[in-house]
Protein backbone atom coordinates (compact mmCIF):
# COMPACT_ATOMS: atom_id res chain seq x y z
CA UNK A 1 0.00 0.00 0.00
CA UNK A 2 1.39 3.37 -0.98
CA UNK A 3 1.80 6.35 1.32
CA UNK A 4 -1.05 8.22 -0.37
CA UNK A 5 -3.46 5.34 0.17
CA UNK A 6 -2.44 5.07 3.81
CA UNK A 7 -2.96 8.79 4.27
CA UNK A 8 -6.42 8.73 2.68
CA UNK A 9 -7.37 5.69 4.75
CA UNK A 10 -6.24 7.40 7.95
CA UNK A 11 -8.13 10.55 7.03
CA UNK A 12 -11.32 8.58 6.37
CA UNK A 13 -10.94 6.74 9.68
CA UNK A 14 -10.41 10.01 11.54
CA UNK A 15 -13.43 11.54 9.82
CA UNK A 16 -15.58 8.55 10.75
CA UNK A 17 -14.47 8.75 14.38
CA UNK A 18 -15.17 12.48 14.46
CA UNK A 19 -18.58 11.89 12.97
CA UNK A 20 -19.37 9.23 15.59
CA UNK A 21 -18.10 11.56 18.31
CA UNK A 22 -20.29 14.41 17.09
CA UNK A 23 -23.30 12.11 16.92
CA UNK A 24 -22.73 10.89 20.50
CA UNK A 25 -22.23 14.47 21.61
CA UNK A 26 -25.52 15.52 20.02
CA UNK A 27 -27.28 12.55 21.64
CA UNK A 28 -25.84 13.47 25.03
CA UNK A 29 -26.89 17.07 24.50
CA UNK A 30 -30.45 15.96 23.71
CA UNK A 31 -30.52 13.72 26.78
CA UNK A 32 -29.23 16.63 28.88
CA UNK A 33 -31.90 18.95 27.53
CA UNK A 34 -34.58 16.32 28.16
CA UNK A 35 -33.37 15.76 31.73
CA UNK A 36 -33.32 19.52 32.33
CA UNK A 37 -36.92 19.87 31.14
CA UNK A 38 -38.06 16.94 33.28
CA UNK A 39 -36.26 18.31 36.35
CA UNK A 40 -37.78 21.74 35.77
CA UNK A 41 -41.25 20.20 35.44
CA UNK A 42 -40.73 18.24 38.67
CA UNK A 43 -39.53 21.36 40.50
CA UNK A 44 -42.56 23.33 39.29
CA UNK A 45 -44.90 20.50 40.34
CA UNK A 46 -43.25 20.21 43.76
CA UNK A 47 -43.51 23.97 44.27
CA UNK A 48 -47.18 23.83 43.29
CA UNK A 49 -47.86 21.05 45.82
CA UNK A 50 -46.07 22.98 48.56
CA UNK A 51 -48.31 26.00 47.97
CA UNK A 52 -51.45 23.88 48.31
CA UNK A 53 -53.21 23.53 51.69
CA UNK A 54 -52.04 20.69 53.91
CA UNK A 55 -55.37 18.89 53.66
CA UNK A 56 -55.62 19.25 49.87
CA UNK A 57 -55.07 15.57 49.09
CA UNK A 58 -57.51 14.43 51.76
CA UNK A 59 -60.08 16.98 50.57
CA UNK A 60 -59.57 15.86 46.97
CA UNK A 61 -60.14 12.21 47.89
CA UNK A 62 -63.21 13.17 49.93
CA UNK A 63 -64.63 15.17 47.02
CA UNK A 64 -64.06 12.25 44.66
CA UNK A 65 -65.75 9.92 47.11
CA UNK A 66 -68.72 12.29 47.43
CA UNK A 67 -69.05 12.55 43.64
CA UNK A 68 -69.00 8.75 43.36
CA UNK A 69 -71.57 8.47 46.14
CA UNK A 70 -73.88 10.92 44.34
CA UNK A 71 -73.51 8.95 41.11
CA UNK A 72 -74.24 5.65 42.87
CA UNK A 73 -77.22 7.20 44.65
CA UNK A 74 -78.61 8.52 41.35
CA UNK A 75 -78.18 5.12 39.69
CA UNK A 76 -79.98 3.44 42.59
CA UNK A 77 -82.85 5.95 42.38
CA UNK A 78 -83.13 5.39 38.62
CA UNK A 79 -83.43 1.66 39.26
CA UNK A 80 -85.99 2.22 42.01
CA UNK A 81 -83.70 0.88 44.77
CA UNK A 82 -82.95 2.16 48.25
CA UNK A 83 -79.35 3.41 48.14
CA UNK A 84 -78.73 3.06 51.88
CA UNK A 85 -79.91 -0.55 51.79
CA UNK A 86 -77.79 -1.35 48.72
CA UNK A 87 -74.71 0.17 50.32
CA UNK A 88 -75.33 -1.70 53.57
CA UNK A 89 -75.51 -5.00 51.70
CA UNK A 90 -72.11 -4.32 50.14
CA UNK A 91 -70.45 -3.61 53.51
CA UNK A 92 -69.88 -5.66 56.61
CA UNK A 93 -72.00 -5.06 59.70
CA UNK A 94 -69.08 -3.56 61.64
CA UNK A 95 -68.27 -1.02 58.93
CA UNK A 96 -71.94 -0.07 58.56
CA UNK A 97 -72.28 0.48 62.31
CA UNK A 98 -69.14 2.63 62.44
CA UNK A 99 -70.35 4.77 59.53
CA UNK A 100 -73.72 5.26 61.21
CA UNK A 101 -72.08 6.31 64.47
CA UNK A 102 -69.79 8.70 62.58
CA UNK A 103 -72.77 10.21 60.78
CA UNK A 104 -74.56 10.80 64.09
CA UNK A 105 -71.48 12.40 65.63
CA UNK A 106 -71.08 14.65 62.61
CA UNK A 107 -74.60 16.05 63.04
CA UNK A 108 -73.97 17.05 66.66
CA UNK A 109 -70.31 16.32 67.48
CA UNK A 110 -69.20 16.02 71.10
CA UNK A 111 -65.86 17.85 71.28
CA UNK A 112 -65.61 17.52 75.04
CA UNK A 113 -66.29 20.18 77.65
CA UNK A 114 -65.11 23.62 76.57
CA UNK A 115 -67.55 25.96 78.31
CA UNK A 116 -71.05 25.91 79.74
CA UNK A 117 -72.25 28.00 76.80
CA UNK A 118 -71.06 25.38 74.29
CA UNK A 119 -72.56 22.60 76.36
CA UNK A 120 -75.91 24.42 76.51
CA UNK A 121 -75.86 25.11 72.76
CA UNK A 122 -75.10 21.45 72.02
CA UNK A 123 -77.96 20.34 74.24
CA UNK A 124 -80.29 22.84 72.56
CA UNK A 125 -79.27 21.52 69.12
CA UNK A 126 -79.89 17.95 70.20
CA UNK A 127 -83.29 18.73 71.72
CA UNK A 128 -84.51 20.76 68.75
CA UNK A 129 -83.36 18.06 66.33
CA UNK A 130 -85.45 15.53 68.26
CA UNK A 131 -88.62 17.64 67.99
CA UNK A 132 -91.26 16.38 65.59
CA UNK A 133 -93.82 18.95 64.33
CA UNK A 134 -97.36 18.19 65.47
CA UNK A 135 -99.65 19.96 63.00
CA UNK A 136 -102.84 18.82 64.72
CA UNK A 137 -101.80 20.35 68.04
CA UNK A 138 -100.66 23.45 66.16
CA UNK A 139 -104.09 23.94 64.57
CA UNK A 140 -105.93 23.28 67.84
CA UNK A 141 -103.74 25.76 69.71
CA UNK A 142 -104.34 28.35 66.99
CA UNK A 143 -108.10 27.91 67.29
CA UNK A 144 -107.97 28.01 71.08
CA UNK A 145 -105.77 31.10 71.41
CA UNK A 146 -107.01 33.02 68.41
CA UNK A 147 -105.25 34.50 65.43
CA UNK A 148 -104.45 37.82 67.10
CA UNK A 149 -102.80 36.18 70.09
CA UNK A 150 -101.26 33.29 68.17
CA UNK A 151 -99.11 35.63 66.06
CA UNK A 152 -98.08 38.14 68.71
CA UNK A 153 -96.78 41.65 68.16
CA UNK A 154 -95.01 44.05 70.48
CA UNK A 155 -98.37 44.98 72.06
CA UNK A 156 -99.62 41.42 72.57
CA UNK A 157 -99.83 39.91 76.04
CA UNK A 158 -99.15 36.18 75.80
CA UNK A 159 -98.75 35.37 79.47
CA UNK A 160 -100.99 32.48 80.44
CA UNK A 161 -102.21 31.82 76.91
CA UNK A 162 -100.19 28.66 76.30
CA UNK A 163 -101.83 25.36 77.14
CA UNK A 164 -99.41 22.42 76.76
CA UNK A 165 -100.93 19.10 75.83
CA UNK A 166 -100.67 15.98 77.95
CA UNK A 167 -98.43 14.27 75.41
CA UNK A 168 -96.08 17.26 75.36
CA UNK A 169 -95.82 17.20 79.15
CA UNK A 170 -95.14 13.46 79.06
CA UNK A 171 -92.35 14.01 76.54
CA UNK A 172 -90.88 16.72 78.76
CA UNK A 173 -90.92 14.46 81.81
CA UNK A 174 -89.38 11.61 79.83
CA UNK A 175 -86.65 13.87 78.47
CA UNK A 176 -85.83 15.27 81.92
CA UNK A 177 -85.52 11.76 83.33
CA UNK A 178 -83.25 10.86 80.41
CA UNK A 179 -81.05 13.89 81.09
CA UNK A 180 -80.74 12.96 84.75
CA UNK A 181 -79.80 9.40 83.82
CA UNK A 182 -77.17 10.53 81.33
CA UNK A 183 -75.77 13.02 83.83
CA UNK A 184 -75.38 10.25 86.39
CA UNK A 185 -73.56 8.09 83.85
CA UNK A 186 -71.20 10.78 82.57
CA UNK A 187 -70.50 12.59 85.82
CA UNK A 188 -70.52 9.67 88.23
CA UNK A 189 -67.71 9.99 90.75
CA UNK A 190 -65.87 6.97 92.01
CA UNK A 191 -66.63 5.96 95.56
CA UNK A 192 -63.95 6.58 98.14
CA UNK A 193 -62.09 3.45 99.20
CA UNK A 194 -60.91 3.78 102.84
CA UNK A 195 -58.61 0.74 102.51
CA UNK A 196 -56.73 2.12 99.51
CA UNK A 197 -53.19 3.39 100.23
CA UNK A 198 -52.91 7.17 100.47
CA UNK A 199 -49.83 8.37 98.62
CA UNK A 200 -51.12 11.75 97.44
CA UNK A 201 -51.82 15.19 98.86
CA UNK A 202 -54.69 16.24 96.57
CA UNK A 203 -56.70 15.06 93.56
CA UNK A 204 -54.22 16.47 91.06
CA UNK A 205 -51.33 14.71 92.76
CA UNK A 206 -53.40 11.50 92.91
CA UNK A 207 -53.89 11.48 89.14
CA UNK A 208 -50.21 12.27 88.60
CA UNK A 209 -49.15 9.37 90.82
CA UNK A 210 -51.43 7.02 88.89
CA UNK A 211 -49.75 8.02 85.65
CA UNK A 212 -46.32 7.46 87.17
CA UNK A 213 -47.36 4.07 88.51
CA UNK A 214 -48.72 3.09 85.11
CA UNK A 215 -45.39 3.61 83.36
CA UNK A 216 -42.80 3.10 86.12
CA UNK A 217 -44.62 0.94 88.67
CA UNK A 218 -42.93 -2.29 87.60
CA UNK A 219 -39.50 -0.69 88.14
CA UNK A 220 -40.21 0.82 91.58
CA UNK A 221 -42.24 -2.03 93.08
CA UNK A 222 -39.23 -3.68 94.74
CA UNK A 223 -38.02 -0.37 96.17
CA UNK A 224 -41.47 0.33 97.66
CA UNK A 225 -41.60 -3.14 99.24
CA UNK A 226 -38.15 -2.67 100.79
CA UNK A 227 -39.13 0.72 102.20
CA UNK A 228 -42.32 -0.69 103.72
CA UNK A 229 -40.44 -3.63 105.30
CA UNK A 230 -37.59 -1.42 106.43
CA UNK A 231 -35.03 -3.41 104.45
CA UNK A 232 -31.79 -1.60 103.85
CA UNK A 233 -31.28 -0.53 100.28
From Swiss-Prot:
Subcellular location: Nucleus
Disordered as annotated region, ranges: 1-80, 95-119
Keywords: Coiled coil, mRNA processing, mRNA splicing, Nucleus, Spliceosome
Main subcellular location of this protein, as a coarse class: nucleus
Biased composition (Polar residues): 1-16
Coiled coil: 18-77
CC terms in the record's Gene Ontology section: catalytic step 2 spliceosome; post-mRNA release spliceosomal complex; Prp19 complex
InterPro entries named among the record's database cross-references: mRNA_splic_SYF2 (IPR013260)
Biased composition annotated in UniProt, kind: Basic and acidic residues: 17-80
Family of this protein: Belongs to the SYF2 family.
Subunit structure of this chain's protein: May be part of a spliceosome complex.
Protein name (database record): Pre-mRNA-splicing factor syf-2
Lineage of the species this protein comes from: Eukaryota, Metazoa, Ecdysozoa, Nematoda, Chromadorea
Amino acid sequence: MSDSEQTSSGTASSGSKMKDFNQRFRDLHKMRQKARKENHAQVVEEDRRKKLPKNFEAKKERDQWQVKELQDRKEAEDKGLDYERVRSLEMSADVTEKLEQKRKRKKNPDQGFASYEDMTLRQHTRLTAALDPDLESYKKMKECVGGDQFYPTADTLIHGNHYPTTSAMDRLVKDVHGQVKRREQYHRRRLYDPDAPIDYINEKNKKFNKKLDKYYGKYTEDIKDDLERGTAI
